[in-house]
């Protein structure tokens, strides 16, 4: 059904981009509500969650995302609201074969299914994706972009360096001998095919076709 395809495309893109850029867990993505998001296409968006794994005092956390020139989570979110007509309640919902939205939020275990359905359409070898892939992919991107540990921990919400290090790629510096010769940073091993960073690149290429 055409309506189902349109809904899924916009929902999936918003889910992937928000999940990637904020390094959200599936539980966090499944609990985002329209009432707790403020978005301006030209500025950015804030997302409030009443609790999360790292919010030990259950005081609630507000996350900030900037509007971007490419892979923009803000535009993807606003486009999804416009297409779906959602004005309240949970943002990410299941969609049946007739293009009807569920009243309740998508189950967190279904998010991995969505990521892998998208990957099957993009990759011939069908690597397995999860929200862990998005978190690792964002960390890959941030390290390549020059973020330090403090910036990463503050953005993602990690409370300890040990938690952050689990997601950080190993870097080796060969200086001027490195072919890329851009600071000499070379990552240990080939890029993980199931990295969220790889998924974003293929999504962008698909949109350009």
Short names for language-model regions:
Residues 1-131, 141-151, 158-198, 202, ...:
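Conserved catalytic core of the tyrosine transesterase superfamily
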């Amino acid at each position: 059904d055409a309506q189902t395809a349109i809904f899924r495309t916009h929902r999936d893109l918003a889910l992937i981009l928000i999940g990637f850029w904020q390094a959200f867990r599936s539980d966090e993505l499944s609990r985002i509500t329209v009432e707790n998001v403020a978005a301006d296409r030209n500025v950015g968006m804030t997302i409030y969650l009443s609790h999360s794994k790292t919010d030990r005092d259950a005081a609630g956390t507000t996350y900030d995302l900037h509007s971007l020139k490419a892979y923009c989570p803000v535009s993807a979110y606003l486009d999804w609201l416009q297409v779906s007509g959602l004005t309240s309640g949970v943002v990410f919902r299941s969609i049946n074969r007739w293009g009807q939205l569920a009243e309740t939020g998508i189950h967190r275990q279904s998010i991995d299914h969505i990521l892998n359905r998208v990957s099957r359409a993009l990759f011939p070898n069908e690597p397995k994706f999860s929200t862990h892939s998005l978190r690792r992919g964002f960390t890959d991107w941030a390290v390549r972009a020059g973020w330090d540990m403090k910036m990463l921990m503050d953005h993602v919400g990690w409370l300890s360096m040990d938690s952050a290090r689990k997601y950080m790629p190993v870097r080796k510096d060969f200086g001027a001998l490195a072919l890329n010769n851009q600071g000499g940073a070379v990552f240990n091993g080939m890029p993980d095919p199931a990295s969220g960073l790889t998924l974003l690149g293929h999504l962008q290429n698909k949109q350009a076709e």
